[in-house]
Amino acid sequence: MSAPSDIVARVRERALQERGELPARVSEWEVAAARRELGFPLPRLLVRLYQEVANGGFGPEYLLLPLVGEGRTAVAEYGPCEYWPHGVLPILDWGCGMYAAVDCLDPDAPVLLFEPNAGPEDWAKAWFTDSPSLTLWLNSWLDGTGWWEEEVMMAEDAPEPPPWPDATSRLAS
């Protein structure tokens, strides 16, 4: 697994290769304002991505949402409700109502998958653990091994993300 400083450099390099020009980076002031608005701290690696790579516009498939700014942002998309737990920040819209989100209250910053399309009566059943940490999730993108990669999805032994074990308790709080 890559060290945090190494992974940020690898993400920036890949983002520049794929996207060319990237959006502006986020300032300390903008991060502080986002924290205040959200009401919880952001994982250090996530902050570094927004400050050292770009304010969104990079990453797997549909690209990370900007943290702040005009239009759709992670901060604007966040809002605890009956199906969205406090402290879980959406970072990528997969389409069809699905999101990748980071559990900002867990020190490991796991990346969760919100997949509501089965129409669960129990919203906890719409939450899955995509990756045990943001670092591992980014590595799966960098290495081409994420579930969203066509080769991985089409494989007979394609992995299914496990249910998020904290979903029920976190949705109740």
Please provide the spans of the model-predicted regions:
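A surface-exposed partner-binding patch
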Residues: M1-Y99, P162, D166-S173
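Long, low-complexity, intrinsically disordered segments enriched in glycines and aromatic residues
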Residues: V53-P162
